[in-house]
């Protein structure tokens, strides 16, 4: 009768499931985290530690979250959790940007425009309610990602206290002398009826008319004399400009040239024209005239203040000098309309050029505009061309496709238009140079971010912070009704208004009667009706939120982390405001991530149908797979996502989960309080495995500390798949299953597995948060009660390295891994040739040189356990049979033969020692010892 020895084996057992079933299980985890107030437990556990503050850039409270939002929040969460594990107190307060045009437009669609069907006060309340709904919807999705934070107390830019603090930030800007009012060209959206911030402008291709226009000389004789070309050439004499915005011609007030460029008087067909010397040929080609003759040359400097007739109005305009004039295109003479271009405005100011003021807020020409009254600017383009043709001053017209600024919200072309606005001056108090100096004090990740924002700061115009909108933080200023000067008590008045806003929100300003605060001054001062640019709202949160929330303890902000578009957005506005108010950058480090694209590198788009939503990913794969994809992707460039890529992430996840399950299953029956083996008593291979984990942990900690999350994933995978999966965990199965349950051989192994599991779960937690929590709940209890959640814990301190006197050091085991790899290769060939079934059916002979023989001899009879074969002989390489193929590992050769011995039904090894015990005639001697004796003794493996 056959005896079943199954109950004498230590078979692995765990309730930790093989399948993650993440989409189903994760919501229950979240419920548990929030019922047990996990975030506050982390705060309590971290109290008193050194702080690390990552300040959340507020997403806009409108619409569902997209994959880019998910990437952003997951990266932040990985950093917060890893910093906690590294021993920092790292609070996370999520935020939302709640004012501004997109919300206004949504609410307009629901209830109509303010002051039409609904009062402005009611409209603001509707905007507030809409934003609150959007916040709640986005919040649920962010929480579902496994992101931990103070979700019950987020910061909203529409919170009354935040609105009040934004007003106080404006006060500091004024106090430090950075605010001024001026009429200046700003980006103006005709659909918004308002100015736009730099970050609200997108460049798209647009087809525009391209025209070459004649400005006839007031005195041809005077111009001939300047060019020393008296009596030369024939026909009328004109300066030629080129433009793609014909509608700006009515506002022309000058022609700009570069003082240092050479200009030619050219016979062009039957007329004489002035062109930059470098552009004569290209202009002649563009207008289709072959006959050209150079009549004279001068520097631009010599043309200054020469006068030319406006092409269709009855006045003349001067030639002025400007450094912005180049020979990159056009004619080298630039049509100058100070109302409609920043360079034009700046150079116009130097020459005291008048502002035309012909275009109203709705983008139409005012009633006094000759020829074009009441026409929209783009509608006027063909009319201007027609007028130029009519008066004989159109040299050439064609269509051109070029990059043109568009409104980010309406996707429609915008214009430059001079309007009275409030500005933060880049030069007023040296703000530009100070900001450039502060940029150099910041760590930029990746480092090219520094050059990018430096260039933007070097070239950016003054910041127009005023908007003509209803839903926004008001510019709570009082100005003189005649002089427009600020009230002398502006700072005190701002604080008084801020206190009221703190109690009642921004509506307190609109409800305020001037007399309440100004008394008799209300006769001569009025309230400013403008609101603040929303980039001022979010840009001031370093002060309006972080400096005022108790969780941050008044500490400086360590990091801002957003998409790479925020160099000109939130990073820029925050830098400008913090430098203006506090003379320093608001952050020590700035990390940017790339945009998400599909598997073919294309931007996500509804029209292409390639949008991957985080909701779909979580429903199909689970949050941990999405998190693993984010972590394993190099965020410094474009982040590619597709179903195929997510499936690969799921495969990687399974390997990690299987490793964790193996550890837990083999810790069955292990009680660290009772069974832990001291390092010096452990078996060599087990000590090496723990040391291996320590090496991995050091690399993983360093990678987390430097935000190299793809390195963390790679190191985690190498540890699970290579060092553990294909070597250590494979080798220990025999010892784990077959030795006596309480033997040193088994407890040593379990001790190693326990240390490794304690470390592994902490490495995983910042990335695979749901799974790490699941593993944590299955780990054996320790002497001191295990913390309820892994997220309150620091990286594991119990790992140890190999001692200096360790005979079988890491170099030894690395060599052995190479030998084992070669033996496995030869075994695989034998398996494929049907010479053997499994490795235990084989008897292996290793022919080795002296170095390898000495190496292998150190394991004695335990070498077979490392090679996972029933019998191993080691012989001198000189004894290698002539017909035995050379090994791929220099210094050894391997031969494999099928064992003729019997197979032990308990350990499955083939042995000549089966039947040595009459009581157990089918068992090998080793199994007899493990079943009824004191148990086999292992030293090395």
Swiss-Prot record:
User: Which residues participate in ATP binding?
Assistant: 606
Binding, Zn(2+)? 904, 907, 924, 927
What Enzyme Commission number does this protein have? 6.1.1.5
Cofactor, free-text remark: Binds 1 zinc ion per subunit.
Q: What CDD domains does the annotation carry?
A: Anticodon_Ia_Ile_BEm (cd07960), IleRS_core (cd00818)
This enzyme catalyses: tRNA(Ile) + L-isoleucine + ATP = L-isoleucyl-tRNA(Ile) + AMP + diphosphate
Short sequence motif named 'KMSKS' region, residue ranges: 603-607
EC top class, as a word = ligase
Q: What are the alphabetically sorted keywords of the record? A: Aminoacyl-tRNA synthetase, ATP-binding, Cytoplasm, Ligase, Metal-binding, Nucleotide-binding, Protein biosynthesis, Zinc
- Its main subcellular localisation, reduced to a broad class, is cytoplasm
Q: What cellular component terms from Gene Ontology apply here? A: cytosol
Domain commentary: IleRS has two distinct active sites: one for aminoacylation and one for editing. The misactivated valine is translocated from the active site to the editing site, which sterically excludes the correctly activated isoleucine. The single editing site contains two valyl binding pockets, one specific for each substrate (Val-AMP or Val-tRNA(Ile)).
Subunit composition and interactions: Monomer.
Protein name (database record) = Isoleucine--tRNA ligase
Task: Give the species this sequence originates from.
Answer: Haemophilus influenzae (strain ATCC 51907 / DSM 11121 / KW20 / Rd)
**Taxonomic lineage from the root:** Bacteria, Pseudomonadati, Pseudomonadota, Gammaproteobacteria, Pasteurellales
């Amino acid at each position: 009768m056959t005896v079943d020895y199954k109950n004498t084996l230590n078979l692995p057992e765990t309730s930790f499931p093989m399948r993650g079933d993440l989409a189903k299980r994760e919501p229950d985890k979240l419920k548990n985290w929030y019922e047990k107030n996990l975030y506050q437990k982390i705060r309590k556990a971290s109290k008193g530690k050194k702080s690390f503050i990552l300040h959340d850039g507020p997403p806009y409270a409108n619409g569902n979250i997209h994959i880019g939002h998910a990437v952003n929040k997951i990266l932040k969460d990985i950093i917060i959790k890893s910093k906690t594990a590294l021993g920092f107190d790292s609070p996370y307060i999520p935020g939302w940007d709640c004012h501004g045009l997109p919300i206004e437009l949504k609410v307009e669609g629901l209830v109509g425009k303010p002051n039409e069907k609904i009062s402005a006060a009611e409209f603001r309340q509707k905007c507030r309610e809409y934003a609150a709904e959007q916040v709640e919807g986005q919040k649920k999705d962010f929480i579902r990602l496994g992101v931990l934070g103070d979700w019950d107390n987020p910061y909203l830019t529409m919170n009354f206290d935040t609105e009040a603090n934004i007003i106080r930030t404006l006060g500091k800007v004024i106090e430090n002398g950075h605010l001024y009012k001026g009429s200046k060209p700003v980006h103006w959206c005709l659909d918004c009826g308002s100015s736009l911030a730099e970050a609200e402008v997108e460049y798209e291709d647009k087809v525009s008319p391209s025209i070459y226009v004649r400005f006839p000389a007031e005195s041809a004789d005077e111009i001939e004399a300047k060019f020393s070309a008296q009596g030369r050439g024939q026909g009328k004499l004109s300066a030629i400009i080129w433009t793609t915005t014909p509608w700006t011609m009515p506002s022309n007030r000058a022609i700009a040239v570069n003082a240092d460029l050479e200009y030619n008087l050219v016979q062009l067909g039957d007329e004489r024209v002035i062109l930059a010397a470098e552009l004569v040929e290209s202009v002649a080609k563009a207008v289709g005239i072959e006959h050209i003759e150079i009549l004279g040359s001068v520097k631009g400097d010599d043309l200054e203040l020469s006068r030319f007739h406006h092409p269709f109005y009855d006045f003349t305009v001067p030639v002025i000098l400007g450094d912005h004039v180049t020979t990159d295109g056009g004619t080298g003479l630039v049509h100058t309309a100070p109302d409609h271009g920043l360079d034009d405005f700046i150079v116009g100011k130097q020459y005291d050029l008048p502002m035309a003021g012909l275009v109203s807020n709705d983008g139409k020409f005012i009633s006094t505009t000759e020829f074009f009254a009441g026409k929209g600017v783009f509608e006027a383009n063909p009319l201007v061309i027609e007028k130029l043709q009519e008066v004989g001053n159109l040299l050439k017209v064609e269509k051109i496709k070029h990059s043109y600024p568009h409104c980010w919200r309406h996707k429609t072309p915008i214009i430059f238009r001079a309007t009275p606005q409030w500005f933060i001056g880049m030069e007023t108090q040296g703000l530009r140079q100070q900001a450039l100096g502060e940029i150099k004090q910041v760590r930029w990740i990746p480092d090219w971010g520094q050059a990018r924002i430096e260039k933007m700061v070097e070239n950016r115009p003054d910041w127009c912070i005023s908007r003509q909108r209803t839903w926004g933080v008001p510019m709570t200023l009082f100005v003189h009704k005649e002089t427009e000067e600020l009230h002398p008590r502006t700072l005190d008045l701002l604080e008084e208004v801020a206190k009221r806003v703190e109690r009642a929100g921004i509506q307190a300003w609109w409800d305020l009667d001037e007399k309440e605060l100004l008394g008799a001054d209300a006769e001569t001062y009025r309230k400013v009706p403008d609101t603040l640019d929303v980039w001022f709202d979010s840009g001031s949160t370093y002060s309006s939120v972080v400096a005022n929330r108790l969780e941050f303890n008044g500490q400086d902000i360590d990091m801002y982390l957003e998409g790479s578009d925020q160099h000109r957005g939130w990073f820029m506005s925050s830098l400008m405001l913090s430098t203006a108010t506090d003379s320093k950058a608001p952050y020590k480090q700035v990390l940017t991530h790339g945009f998400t694209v599909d598997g073919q590198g294309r931007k996500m788009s509804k029209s292409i149908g390639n949008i991957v939503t985080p909701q779909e990913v979580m429903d199909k794969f689970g949050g941990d797979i999405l998190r693993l994809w984010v972590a394993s992707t190099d965020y410094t460039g474009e982040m590619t996502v597709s179903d195929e890529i997510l499936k690969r992430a799921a495969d990687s996840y399974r390997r990690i989960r299987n490793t964790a399950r193996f550890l837990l299953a083999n810790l069955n029956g292990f009680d660290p309080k009772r069974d832990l083996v001291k390092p010096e008593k452990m078996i060599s291979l087990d000590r090496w495995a723990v040391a291996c984990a320590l090496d991995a942990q050091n690399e993983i900690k360093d990678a987390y500390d430097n935000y190299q999350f793809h390195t963390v994933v790679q190191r985690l995978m190498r540890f699970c798949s290579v060092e553990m999966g294909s070597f250590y965990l494979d080798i220990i199965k025999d010892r784990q299953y077959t030795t006596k349950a309480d033997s040193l051989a088994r407890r040593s192994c379990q001790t190693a597995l326990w240390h490794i599991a304690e470390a592994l779960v902490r490495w995983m937690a910042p990335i695979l948060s749901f799974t790490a929590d699941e593993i944590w709940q299955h780990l054996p209890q320790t002497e001191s009660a295990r913390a309820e959640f892994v997220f309150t814990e620091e990286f594991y301190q119990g790992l140890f390295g190999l001692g200096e006197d360790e005979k079988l050091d890491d170099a030894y085991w690395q060599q052995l891994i190479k030998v084992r790899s070669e033996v496995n290769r030869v075994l695989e060939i034998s398996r494929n040739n049907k010479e053997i079934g499994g490795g235990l059916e084989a008897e292996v002979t290793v022919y080795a040189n002296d170095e390898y023989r000495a190496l292998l001899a150190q394991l004695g009879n335990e070498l077979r356990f490392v090679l996972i074969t029933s019998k191993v002989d080691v012989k001198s390489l000189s004894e290698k049979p002539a017909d035995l193929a050379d090994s791929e590992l220099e210094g050894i050769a391997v031969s494999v033969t099928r064992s003729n011995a019997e197979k032990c039904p308990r350990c499955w090894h083939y042995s000549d020692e089966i039947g040595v015990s009459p009581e157990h005639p089918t068992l090998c001697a080793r199994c007899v010892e493990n079943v009824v004796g004191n148990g086999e003794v292992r030293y090395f493996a």
